Amino acid sequence: MSSNRPIKILFDSYHLYHLPQFDPVIDLLSHDDRFEIFHSTCSDNKKIELDLCLTVLESKPGTLVFAETEEERMEKIRALDLDVFICGWSRYPIGKFVSNNTLVGMIYHGIGVKPSYWRDNSTRLNIRFVEGQYRMDQLVNNGIETDLVLTGFTKLDPLFHGDDERFNDLKNSLRLDPNKKTILFAPTFYPSSIEKFGMKLGEYTMDYNVILKPHMWTYFLDEFSEYNLKPQRKLVYNLSEKFDHIKLLGPETYNIIPYYQISDVLLTEASSTIYEMIALEKPVIVNRFFRLKLSHKLFRYRLFRKRLSKEMNDDISNFCFEMEKASDLPSMLETSLQDNYNKLDIMRDYQKKMLFQLDGKASQRVRDTILDRLENRS
């Protein structure tokens, strides 16, 4: 690696929801003269997502690489002769974007309970940055031979940088009632519980602030695997219009991380958000009721085969509060806020397993690993 020019590194935010994992690394490298930063996103994405992602990426430090087609994007990125290419998943022909000499790394876009975590591992990956020892073991046990490096979860770094003023500004911008506890409701798009709540969600939570953060697919997709997402989208808008205490975050709010800090309890399904919230040792309520498509109602095992890891899904019950029906929400909120201390020891065990070091320095470990691998190559 020549020392006469900066290291060319591109962050490929294939989808906008990949970007929160990259943001702390981008911020770190933007203050490091050894690196020249580039950004890109998939040109085949739906226009509503593509336009928003391009707007966000244009605001980031570095150079945006845009093309009208994926073929043109491949050519433009390959012509950069990158030193490093970072992706958030690897289920596309990465080898066509880079030369054989490019170091390809993956900071995976989620830490949740989906089997895709270990199924998504292209042979073109040179290195994979891993959030915790549990995941290291899981990848190895599923036959992954990529160079695995234990760094911690970069996405969580901002939670440990002590930016209290920013968090206070966030509270004020949402006009949260300071006399009420705050619920962060982060329903995934499928399988989701929000339709089981319906408009009753507003009634069940009248004594709280609610920050409602739907998955981006709720906004961007009309259908997912024959499941209609339009009613979900209509419902979240109706809830925020009818109830003043429900604050809806639009798709432009692509990063949920700051909202963990200003919330008292997380409400969700089996998703990555669980492991992100426990980094702050706050209570998590997991909804065990969903609106399912017919094939998953009839053959529940298909849900676990395609969407969930049964082992991790079962583990959640050890450190979360589980809810079997929507009408239990008022009492479950009280229980979770009062009794979370009973689960702290187990929660801390899972922190160590899933999240390695919660010191705000995962991004530094990613940077140092990149520098080390490039140095050893030369």
What are these regions (language model features)?
Residues 85-87, 100-106, 251-300:
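A donor-sugar binding/catalytic signature common to diverse glycosyltransferases
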Residues 10-161:
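Active-site and donor-binding regions of nucleotide-sugar-utilizing enzymes
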Residues 18-28, 156-236, 249, 358:
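Conserved catalytic-core segment of nucleotide-activated headgroup transferases in glycan assembly
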Residues 63-69, 247-251, 318-328:
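Short acidic-hydrophobic, aromatic-tinged amphipathic segments that line or gate anion-handling sites
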Residues 272-350, 354:
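Catalytic binding pocket for nucleotide-activated donors in carbohydrate/polymer assembly enzymes
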Residues 359-378:
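C-terminal alpha-helical cap of glycosyltransferases
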Residues 42-48, 218-231, 294-300:
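Short, flexible/disordered intra-domain loops and linkers
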Residues 68-72, 76, 227-275, 279:
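Donor nucleotide-activated moiety binding/catalytic core segment of transferases
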